[in-house]
Amino acid sequence: MNNNSQPVFSSRAVLMNFLVLVLCSQFAFAVLAMKGALLPQMLELWNISKTQFGMLMSIYGIVHNIFYVALAWVQDRFSARVLIPVNMVMGGVTTFFLGQTTDFATLCFLFVMLSLWCEGAFWPAVLSAVRKTTADSNQGKIFGLLEGGRGCVELLQNSLTVALYVYLGYSILGLQLAFMVNALVMVILGVVAWFMLPSQTLLKTDNDARQANQEVLAGMKLTLRLPEVWLAGAVGFCVYFVYTAMPYFVTYLDEMYVLPALAISIFGIASTSGGRIAVAFPSGFIAGRLFGGAVGGLGGGFALTLVLGLAMVGLAWIEAASWLAMVCLMGIAFAIFFMRALYFAPYGEMGLPQRFSGSVIAIASFIVYLPSSFAYLLWALILDGNPGAEGYLQMFFAISVLSIVGLFLARTLRRRMSSGTAHRVAQQVIQLDAALGLQGEEKKLSDLIDQANNKNKREFSP
């Protein structure tokens, strides 16, 4: 069978496992989801400025970047059942308390804990499990489905939050209730994940702890020497840097056009959740058909953000009509979510074995999400330090510059991968196995899921 004809999900059990990952991956980021549509209200709830919010996001980013690197090796050494459920439960507890305080020092502490539980080992484990769910040829599709599915959940989250906010007379009590509901769901999902996710790893030395550690470290040495791994991370870095400006699209409309709070919230939901649903779901299929794969799709996305970013520079300068600004901002948001759905797909497309994908994705997460440790604060300082249109003009110009850099890196990565990266990786893996005395076929996560599902059926059948 041709690799391209393989289904995205090999069985119903694999699909159900993926749906659990989608739910966990979005509810774990409930607080971050709210900022896209309700940042002004969140600032009111916590009684903080945009700069203080930027500090909170920078703290969050610094902490999770440290843990991405420190815990990279555990991604291949331990199973998803070990890495995901407990973090979901503890993240739920932290989310509950975030809706109960206005003390900035307490908020700083809670953001540290939220980053520990909902990022650290958790997020790379989710990404790694998603990458292992399907064949290398389906990586753009599976990550597009992940991002689109998360968008559906985010739409539900933000719609509920806005509904509570409006129903309770535009009171921050609605936000507090939303924090409580999301916290409860996170705890429940943590319990469900414990029973659903597979308990085995994909290592060939899974039953020997010492040899398993050697295999993981050898795999990390092999994969992290590949220039393509770092290039793909740099492309994702540019995507995420641009993404961090999105919360300030809402404040731009609020400050420049003084639109009603409800109208701005609706725009925020449409541009974030709507963008993820409308664009992310088909992104892998679009990238494969129109751009020759995920890397080509990333280049196309940067070309669009470059054009629209420059357009927003002009619109901010002349203070154009609000509807025109909203159309351009919506276009940038859609391009960002198109790229976000693709920026981890190259790690599967370049032929990295599933058993070594976790640690690579953890290091990639460090690179990709590095802007979260400084970019939110940087944008806030630019906007607070340059009130009015001047600050936003600088922000949109910076988005254009980042798009140029990202486009260049994506084109470079595509050229290298076209020169035979997958073949070179396969040869190096054969040499690694020979050096360690490892034998046997490569394990697949989908096979482990099906085996566990069949075992459960036998145990519970009459």
Model feature map: region roles:
Residues 35-39, 154-161, 226-280, 340, ...:
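Extracytoplasmic gate region of multi-pass secondary transporters
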Residues 66-104:
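Conserved MFS/SLC helix-loop-helix module at the cytosolic interface between two early adjacent transmembrane helices
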Residues 67-79, 278-293, 383-384:
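Helix-to-loop junctions at the C-terminal end of transmembrane segments
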Residues 77-88, 288-304:
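Cytoplasmic membrane-interface "Motif A"-like loop-to-helix N-cap segments
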Residues 140-165, 365-376:
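Glycine-rich segments within core transmembrane alpha-helices of 12-TM secondary carriers
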Residues 194-221, 419-433:
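Flexible cytoplasmic inter-helical loops of multi-pass small-molecule transporters
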Residues 293-343:
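C-terminal transmembrane helical hairpin of 12-TM major facilitator-type secondary transporters
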